[in-house]
Amino acid sequence: MTGSTAAARELKAGGSLKGAVRVPGDKSISHRALLFGAIADGVTTIEGLLPAEDPISTAACLRAMGAEISPIGEGDLIRVTGVGLDGLQEPDTVLDCGNSGTTMRLMLGLLAGRDGRHFVLTGDASLRRRPMQRVGQPLAMLGAEVRGRGDGNYAPLAVQGRRLRGAVVGTPVASAQVKSALLLAALTADGPTTVIEPAPSRDHSERMLKAFGADLTVGGEMGRHISVKPGARLQGQHVVVPGDISSAAFWLVAGALVPGADLTVENVGLNPTRTGVLDVLEQMGAKIEVLNRRDVAGEPVGDLHVTSGPLQPFRFGEEIMPRLVDEVPILTVAACFCEGESHISGAAELRVKETDRLAVMARQLKTMGADLDETPDGLVIRGGRPLRGAALDSETDHRVAMSLAVASLLASGDSTLERSDAAAVSYPSFWDDLARLRI
């Protein structure tokens, strides 16, 4: 990995955390609001959109194809003027997805059915190493043509728009990105499409596509069969993006671990396909209350109040993984402070995220004195050993950066963190919020 261009951030150990915090808008919902707004008729307004690097990459790609999207800044109401279901133009440049796997995978589905138009997608060095065939192969069953390095597995990727046919497609993994790419492609196919997942994954696309007017039905065991009939035009909507539970997870674990902590995380999305982290924290004995439950724009929302107390070790595997895949790094930190052995399995997907998150978390936490081992698809953590301050490195991964920040609060001495600015990918104000909540 290359060295940091910025100075390492100092992370002071000790103290406690008190107060209320509102985490940025949900990243998954932010991407989808921009994408669906761009292919709808009329104007879509988005409240609470995550003003971070990944959704900004999605917006830039859509602007390059003719959608009008107002500038994205913190607190802004975003306006998207859609071009209609088949109005995206062939861009005169390569579409740069930055560091965003969601942008690239959803774009593959969005663009596959743009008959007669040609698109090239690329990204940063990390994204160009992430597997894309898991989207390209199922799309090929609809007639899509995606080419790239490694037989279409790695960007840069070329998409030659085709007239797609409807089909029944089984996805190789329970992945909301794969499913959403197929649903986007199905909107302009000739004939209906049914996507069958091996296990349920987050369902933000289904909820939002229905709200925009798509002819979409969900059925089968545990809602694993999603069917789309093409032809229904999407209409611009007002979308309210709830806070991202994946960002809230850092405060939930910090509040449960740091002695004397008392935190309220406000306006958090509580979609049941995303709340696996709450189930695991409950299993650990964390003191978390859900307050002010409500529904906002078709998504369940609430405020989460957490106070500190002793935690028990945990064990979870592939059955819950789609509901908490992004929270594995911070739960690994939590396990370090539980007396006993915790087991994470079924998490091989984390080896192909922005980094190999299993390897990076093991490497960095061992630097602090943690006792943990990697397995091919997970981690075994023997908790209860005190962690020491250390020279740490996010290795460019936003979730690693924030997880290590929480670990450093509980270390016996101060730490430093290289490439701490990685947090901005999903949580630009994280470091400011941490400073404000510390007492």
Curated annotation (Swiss-Prot):
Coiled-coil spans in chain: none
Query: Superkingdom of this entry's organism?
Result: Bacteria
Its primary localisation, in coarse terms, equals: cytoplasm
Q: Which residues cross the membrane?
A: none
Q: List the disulfide bonds.
A: none
Belongs to which family?
Belongs to the EPSP synthase family.
Record protein name field: 3-phosphoshikimate 1-carboxyvinyltransferase
Species for this entry: Synechococcus sp. (strain WH7803)
